[in-house]
Regions:
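A short beta-loop-alpha structural element at the N-terminal edge
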Residues: 2-14
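Acetyl-CoA-dependent GNAT
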Residues: 8, 30-86, 97-98, 103, ...
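Helix-loop element at the rim of GNAT/NAT acetyltransferase active sites that forms part
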Residues: 16-33
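Conserved beta-strand-loop-alpha-helix junction that forms the acyl-donor binding cleft
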Residues: 88, 114-124, 143
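Conserved acetyl-CoA-binding loop-helix of GNAT-fold acetyltransferases
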Residues: 89-104, 126-130
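Conserved GNAT acetyl-CoA-binding A-motif
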Residues: 104-117
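Conserved acetyl-CoA-binding loop of GNAT-fold acetyltransferases
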Residues: 129-139
Length: 167
C-alpha cells in the first residue's frame, strides 16, 4: 500500500468511501445525506493536509491532518481517517495512522488529539491505543449511534515527542 498527498483529482475516488463510511451511522457524526460539496470542504478545506492510501493504484482510504486549535493551541494536531469498508481489517488504517504521526511530527506538532472517537468503534479505539493514544476524556452519550442509540465518545491524546516546559 502506498500513501501520498491527496489532490483535487482524488476526490472522485474519495467520495464513495466517505459515503459508505457515513451511511452506517456508527462511526462519524455526519448526516448520511451530507452533500458532495460539504464532503469536499471537509477533506480539502483551508489549513489542512489530506492524504490517500492506495492499493494496486486504487484509493482505499484517506486521512486529513490539521491543527486541533488555532493560535496558542496550534501545537496539537488533529486528524480524521476513513477506510473503504471493503478494506477494513487490511492494515490500511494502521498504515495511515503511523504515516499521520510521522507527518505530524515533521510538521512540528508536539501532540495529537482526537476529539470524538465513538466508544463503540472498537477497531478504532483498539488501533489508537496500540499507537500510543490514551483516553483522556469521556463525552457521555455524545453520539447518536444508528443501532445502539446514544453512546459515549472519547477524547484521545498522545504526545509526539518529549515535551519540555518553556524556559
Amino acid at each position: 500500500m502506498d500513501i501520498r498527498r491527496a489532490t483535487e483529482g482524488d476526490f472522485d475516488a474519495m467520495w464513495p468511501i466517505f459515503q459508505a463510511v457515513i451511511a452506517s451511522g456508527t462511526t462519524y457524526s455526519f448526516d448520511p445525506g451530507t452533500s458532495r460539496a460539504d464532503a469536499h470542504a471537509y477533506w480539502f478545506g483551508p489549513g489542512l493536509s489530506s492524504y490517500v492510501i492506495e492499493e494496486g493504484g486504487r484509493v482505499v482510504g484517506m486521512y486529513k491532518l490539521r491543527a486541533n486549535q488555532r493560535d496558542l493551541g496550534a501545537h496539537v494536531a488533529n486528524a480524521s481517517f476513513m477506510v473503504d469498508p471493503a478494506h477494513q481489517g487490511s492494515g490500511a488504517g494502521r498504515a495511515m495512522g503511523l504515516h499521520c504521526l510521522e507527518e505530524a511530527r515533521r510538521a512540528g506538532f508536539l501532540a495529537m488529539q482526537f476529539n470524538f472517537v465513538v466508544s463503540t468503534n472498537e477497531a478504532a479505539v483498539r488501533l489508537w491505543k496500540a499507537l500510543g493514544f490514551k483516553v483522556v476524556g469521556v463525552l457521555p452519550r455524545a453520539f447518536r449511534h444508528r443501532q445502539l442509540g446514544y453512546v459515549d465518545a472519547y477524547v484521545m491524546h498522545r504526545f509526539l515527542e518529549d515535551v519540555q516546559a518553556p524556559g
